[in-house]
A protein has these predicted regions:
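Hydrophobic ligand-binding cavity/cleft-lining segments
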Residues: 1-41, 46, 153
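Short, surface-exposed coil-to-beta transition loops
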Residues: 3-5, 61-65, 87-91
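Preference for bulky hydrophobic residues occupying beta-strand positions
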Residues: 6-8, 53-55, 79, 92, ...
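Structural motif
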Residues: 11, 71-73, 97-99
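Amphipathic alpha-helical segments that line or abut small-molecule/effector binding pockets
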Residues: 15-18, 131, 135
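Glycine-rich portal/gate segments that line the openings of hydrophobic small-molecule binding cavities
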Residues: 38-85, 102, 132-151
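Beta-strand/loop substructures that line and gate deep hydrophobic ligand-binding cavities in soluble
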Residues: 80-132, 148-149
Length: 153
């Protein structure tokens, strides 16, 4: 299994930060490893809400459908995805910090089937992907949001 964990600071209030991150389609705005993202279910984000992300994988594009498995409003969201090639899980925690927030992000990827034998080889590449995503997230959370990114109240 490959794991990447990071902590970043947000200039935005914790509630707005959480809303922005829980709307997982926003990953396409800050994670350079996400080519496209869409919410598959209508309505607010809740347990069971699904998001399709298109990511590069082994030189091709792969669609992953993430589903919200845990949601503690304003505090924590856990999403999981599974394909025939891999399993992924992302856990996001948001804590108030003054006028802003602290975000702890953990992403795990585990290869499946015959590829599982290569799991340890995934770690260095996943670390580099995580570092680029963290830089993008830190930039997004330090920047005033434009109207299409702003959380919906």
């Amino acid at each position: 299994m490959a794991r990447y964990a990071a902590t970043v600071t947000s200039q935005h209030p914790a509630a707005d930060t959480f809303s922005y991150l829980a709307t997982f389609t926003n990953t396409a705005d800050w994670d350079p490893g996400v080519i496209a993202a869409e919410q598959l279910d209508s309505g607010p984000v809740r347990p069971g809400t699904r998001f399709r992300l298109v990511v590069p994988f082994l030189g091709r594009r792969m669609a992953l459908t993430y589903q919200v498995v845990t949601l503690v409003p304003g505090r924590e969201i856990v999403l999981a995805a599974s394909s025939r090639l891999l399993r992924a899980a992302d856990r996001i925690l948001v804590d108030p910090a003054g006028d802003g927030a602290t975000v702890s992000y953990q992403a795990d990827v585990r290869l499946r089937g015959p590829l599982a034998l290569l799991d340890t080889l995934l770690r260095p590449g996943f670390r580099a992907i995580g570092q680029r995503a963290t830089a993008g997230l830190a930039h997004a959370l330090a920047t005033p949001w434009v109207s299409h990114q702003a959380p919906q109240s």
